[in-house]
């Protein structure tokens, strides 16, 4: 926001600021005229290119589907002044993924002080099942190396097993 100087994310609605949009009467989540804009290849390209210094090209993703399934699990690691940094925790986590034949992709966080480990599924999985997989990988990684305390582990996306009614879940 140019007014507050803070970054924020919100779904892009095709009806925002049109005559169908009545922000005085409805929150976006409750709006009967809510119609999300579809992502385009140009949106993806601009996001990956990352040239907008104000971050307007950044895309967020709501991971949880309406039927409580997800197409991916994202594990968030942030450097919280842990002795060894987040990198060792990430490497221990992906070492388990590798040994269990779980494909993954590592992405450095926008801040540069952390990373996301992405696990993509061939078909939608129940969020509860995806989160159990993440917990199993995390537990095994901790068991393999007692020196790693995983202080940098922040959370999984999706954050919850079920989608709150009328909600979108958590954004990554």
Which residue ranges define each predicted feature?
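Signature for HUH/AEP ssDNA processing cores
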Residues: 1-113, 120-132, 136
